[in-house]
Amino acid sequence: MITSVYAKIEYVTNTKMLFVANNWGYWVNVKPNSGFSRTDNNVLVFLHELTFLAQNNAINKELYAFKSLKEKEWFKALLTINGIGPKTAMNVMVNKQEEVLTLIKNNDLNGLLRLENINKKVATMLLASDIASKHYLKNQIVVSDKVEPQIDDDEKIDDSKDLNDDELLSEIVIEAIDCLISLGYKQEQIKTALAEIDLKNESINDSADLVAVIIKQIGLRTSEVS
């Protein structure tokens, strides 16, 4: 699971971007006016992966790219709001995070409606949430953007430089649980399945792998009961 890379931007539009890192090309989603440019070389890109179930029951993944960790955490926080998906979250992020949070905290509907890309439906969902007061917003989103040390273009990107194995595994589990809940699985089902799975299994490399294993385990338990 890649959380950040140093990359060369090859192509960027208002919603999509192609970048190259370690001779691999990545086609990712970006917010409007993302701040990325084709002139960017060896720029740090923060990534968030979303896993979803396609119509043919295949598990698909999409990558979302951000200029800072603060942006990435803001995106993840917006996705916790009922009714807000990745496209809407990206559109909300065109506006300054602090301004959006202040308007939500003040219950200012008219103020939200004056912002770009926020209609009455989205504004109502924002106001109905408790996003402005959640603990993780204070501790994760409102952080200073620090300058990261530059590395050579040909240096191999390895997530283990920043996260140890247990931290990576914890993030994989959290993302897998979020995905399964969004697919309609109950927390008790997920918890029971997790207790029966060897999380150190080499076949589990990312959240998509874990989602597939948990779904299979839930299916086995269901067939045993029936």
Curated annotation (Swiss-Prot):
UniProt keyword annotations, A-Z: Cytoplasm, DNA damage, DNA recombination, DNA repair, DNA-binding
Transmembrane segments: none
Superkingdom of origin: Bacteria
Region (Domain I): 1-67
Record keyword GTP-binding present: no
Gene3D superfamilies for the chain: 5' to 3' exonuclease, C-terminal subdomain
Family annotation (InterPro entries): RuvA (IPR000085), RuvA_2-like (IPR010994), RuvA_C (IPR011114)
GO biological process, one term: DNA repair
Ranges for region Domain III: 168-226
The keyword DNA damage is assigned to this record: yes
Subunit structure of this chain's protein: Homotetramer. Forms an RuvA(8)-RuvB(12)-Holliday junction (HJ) complex. HJ DNA is sandwiched between 2 RuvA tetramers; dsDNA enters through RuvA and exits via RuvB. An RuvB hexamer assembles on each DNA strand where it exits the tetramer. Each RuvB hexamer is contacted by two RuvA subunits (via domain III) on 2 adjacent RuvB subunits; this complex drives branch migration. In the full resolvosome a probable DNA-RuvA(4)-RuvB(12)-RuvC(2) complex forms which resolves the HJ.
Protein name in UniProt: Holliday junction branch migration complex subunit RuvA
Organism: Mycoplasmoides gallisepticum (strain R(low / passage 15 / clone 2)) (Mycoplasma gallisepticum)
Originating gene: ruvA
